[in-house]
Amino acid sequence: MLCGNHQLYNNVEAQIANFHEVESALIFNSGYNANVGFFSCVPQRGDIVFYDELIHASIRDGLRMSPAKCYKFDHNDFFNLRDKAEKFAEDFEGEIYVVTESVFSMDGDSPDLESFADICDKNDFNLIVDEAHALGVFGEQGKGLVHKLGLQNRVFAQVITFGKALGCHGAAVLGNENLYTYLVNFASSLIYTTALPPHALASISAGYHFLENLPKTKVLSKLQENIEHFKIEVARLGLLDIFVPSNSAIHCCIVPGNESVKAVSVILKGYDFEIKPILYPTVPKGKERLRICLHSSNSKKDISKILKVVVNTIP
């Protein structure tokens, strides 16, 4: 930062902000750095943060560094959030932040973002949405679930990452110009580290160029078709009781026990399916799982085959 910005930073940040229809985008080295940087410095002493109990570890780490008081609410439970948050709404002088994700990484499910936005509008709360697993999957040109629902002007900040759908390094915090300026001056994970090199920025820009041209391709529609086919097959094969409900590209099959889920993963590997097991303590004991990530390149035959293997493998 002492040497100033490379022009590519200015260009790519403007490209990202324009794409997402927001005032500004500030690039960080990673999603972890973005969340730690944001949550360690934005909520102040005297503020309150309400966060979903299953938020990313990076958000939790950032909140541990924040002087604000932090309270969790039950996963995707709007009513639990409302009951807790509205107790503080009247006569509270500090800022109140509500933190969630548009798609949760270990479940693939989503909150009712419109209801979250409504309660934040009603009480003047600040809504923050981590969009790591929604970019390139939902909305026009893959702009994310916030944009698909038309909420981009009703959230205080979005955190997006480039290591998922775009397949490159980096992340960005989307918000207004004041937030951009504040983070540049106070986000330690941005200030006290070496910035991404120019070739990484070129990769991000190329990824966004691809998203900008998605309507000319069938990539996004093919992915949505695969998601729907997967859900239909799960129901048809009677697997609803072991799969976490999801409308995203992430679908999780619960296989209790670290050794059990690892064994099923090995069997799937024998059928050329690269499905990684998610083990305790990453997820709660008894909730170990297979995490299946769908792609536009998958065929319906592939999807049906993997689910048939699951049927024949899991007791």
Identify what each model region corresponds to:
Residues H147-Y182:
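Active-site PLP attachment segment
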Residues A195-K216, K222, N226:
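Structural motif of enzymes handling amino- and sulfur-group chemistry
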Residues A14, N18, G270, T282-P315:
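PLP-dependent enzyme catalytic core of the Aspartate aminotransferase-like
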Residues V219-K231, L237-D272, T282, L294-S296:
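Conserved PLP-binding catalytic core of the aspartate aminotransferase-like
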Residues F38-A57, N226, L268:
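Conserved PLP-anchoring active-site segment centered on the Schiff-base-forming lysine
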Residues Y71, H75-V129:
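Active-site phosphate-binding strand-loop segment of PLP-dependent enzymes
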Residues N29-S30, F50-P67:
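Substrate-binding/gating loop at the entrance of the active-site cleft, primarily
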Residues M1-G31:
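Conserved N-terminal alpha-helix of the aminotransferase class I/II PLP-enzyme fold
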